[in-house]
């Protein structure tokens, strides 16, 4: 029988396939076991999945959870639960983007370490070297280095800069350079002492733009996101929406309505900032964890030099405070905190913003890493930490963990209920107040300006005074003193605005956060 030249004998093909498979196994005996999860990983996945379902049932205010667990350089658990967008009934999946807030610092510090190695912006240079040409009102000594900015020991302060960059979004480069130069103060007594805030990373972003004419967003894309294959990660909200990427919309508890609502503060390009300005997926965070846990190697390649990875994970200053769930006086490296859990070293960085919570951590000694992202922040931060420690305790074999975590869930839900009731009681108390404004509402309408904090626009909304400060919009409620109103510039944080009058009795200013805003229109 003459066989076709284009077809092989099926029996011969089977024999060839068997030989190839046997050779592959001999060359890599672990390959056989990599084809399917082992019994322990399966048990872990079953228990973890069940616990997350219990959490979301007991705390239904949580819209969605995305979680990845890395063990021995492999993702053994990668899932998303719930809704990215409740109003549109859009489900979350492992490619859904979440805003990770301050967890961005780890990425920014890595980019800074790469530039340091290349001699472009040296970490141990004085920051004044890169601020040359700016007239700094504060006398900043040369001992304040770029590294100090990134490990929170600079002794610098500038509340208006960090507020505008993270919240209001009135943060164009020229104006922020001016606010940096004019408003920054230096306190020598604070120099060298850890004081966590966004300022150092914000200043680094400005110096980067000034020195290399490079936006921090583009630096992250070129040096980190692209080389790591993080295709579902961006520092531009506009690009995510243009690509029709699913974004987990932000939610939070509203004491006014007694329900979970969309966060009134949104993230746009203008308030995505170098201390907290990334959106990423849980799949991409799995790659990020693997890179950090494997000394810069990913998928068999050395993507980031090992010496740079070591520099990021080395502690440079004592934090002198607990950072739940990791206790003990820890250290701060370059964009990473270093602490302990169950007497094991943990390297981590959390993030939080109205409507989003993130937890990223790993235990190098046990080769375990976990990331959790939640699009809610009233209780989301605590839930994320609880899920992370559940993972660690399960994989460490902690005794009685199921009973322990059932109790933690119940206690947490009970405390959350008490917090909600306390906030609603405060709303009921404030509802008894009456307006103390002495003029018709229209008389207060106008634009008020402060050179440090920007512009406040006062309008009439719902028979009350409305306020717009950059991206932020809110409606005031009565306060207890003449010509004052209560506002929540940041959700859940009540503050007072007081209007001022000129000698002719005309409204010419308002005061907010201890600063005077002059009426300009």
Regions found by a protein language model. Give the residues of each.
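Bacterial Sec-dependent N-terminal signal peptides
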Residues: 1-37
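Active-site-proximal loop and beta-strand segments within enzyme catalytic domains
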Residues: 45, 57-59, 83-198, 205, ...
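Catalytic loop of the DD-peptidase/beta-lactamase superfamily, centered on the K-T-G motif
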Residues: 35-79, 209-222, 226, 263-521
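Helix-centric, low-specificity signal for extended rod-like, repetitive segments
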Residues: 9, 21, 98, 413-416
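Active-site-proximal flexible loops/turns
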Residues: 73, 112, 162, 236, ...
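A generic hydrophobic-helix recognition signal that picks specific residues
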Residues: 26, 98, 190-191, 206, ...
